[in-house]
Amino acid sequence: MGYIPYVIENTDRGERSYDIYSRLLKDRIVLLSGEINDSVASSIVAQLLFLEAEDPEKDIGLYINSPGGVITSGLSIYDTMNFIRPDVSTICIGQAASMGAFLLSCGAKGKRFSLPHSRIMIHQPLGGAQGQASDIEIISNEILRLKGLMNSILAQNSGQSLEQIAKDTDRDFYMSAKEAKEYGLIDKVLQKNVK
């Protein structure tokens, strides 16, 4: 991840130093940045579970700037978002592509956002296989199963038909924030933080 900034907060007990991610977590903000893999997913899942334990009623903000990544890693985040009691608001900052766009669309209804110059891209799952023909067939069937699952969830989240999702995800399908709103992947394009 590289350099991690620290912030200093003054309290009645003196100064306290936090890494920026811990400080954001205090405000119930989780940052999903970069490629989604098992390590990143474990960190996101742990933060979501921690925030639920802290306050099961208060919303969590999941900020996404990701080119996508491993399907099963992303699905573990998706399942956790649905498992926990707080609503998870999703906010695209920069880009949400592939699994990043999928997770963006999975935020709580009415709470899926993007900043105005972000890019959102959906497509079909990528995969490859080698080995014996029977092994390749098994992997191919699993990729097709995951494609069907993800298309079904995207259709449900966006209001688009399954046929339209299948057509649009056949190749990389890029959208601006405004186009993603019209498509149904997000609910609003944010201009200013109104907190």
Swiss-Prot record:
Transmembrane segments: none annotated. PROSITE patterns: CLP_PROTEASE_HIS, CLP_PROTEASE_SER. The keyword Protease applies. One of its GO terms (biological process) is protein quality control for misfolded or incompletely synthesized proteins. InterPro entries: ClpP, ClpP/crotonase-like_dom_sf, ClpP/TepA, ClpP_His_AS, ClpP_Ser_AS. PANTHER family: ATP-DEPENDENT CLP PROTEASE PROTEOLYTIC SUBUNIT. It catalyses: Hydrolysis of proteins to small peptides in the presence of ATP and magnesium. alpha-casein is the usual test substrate. In the absence of ATP, only oligopeptides shorter than five residues are hydrolyzed (such as succinyl-Leu-Tyr-|-NHMec, and Leu-Tyr-Leu-|-Tyr-Trp, in which cleavage of the -Tyr-|-Leu- and -Tyr-|-Trp bonds also occurs). The lineage of its organism: Bacteria, Pseudomonadati, Campylobacterota, Epsilonproteobacteria, Campylobacterales. It comes from the Bacteria. Belongs to the peptidase S14 family. GO terms for molecular function: ATP-dependent peptidase activity; ATPase binding; serine-type endopeptidase activity. This is ATP-dependent Clp protease proteolytic subunit. Keywords: Cytoplasm, Hydrolase, Protease, Serine protease. Cleaves peptides in various proteins in a process that requires ATP hydrolysis. Has a chymotrypsin-like activity. Plays a major role in the degradation of misfolded proteins. It comes from Helicobacter pylori (strain G27). Pfam families: CLP_protease.
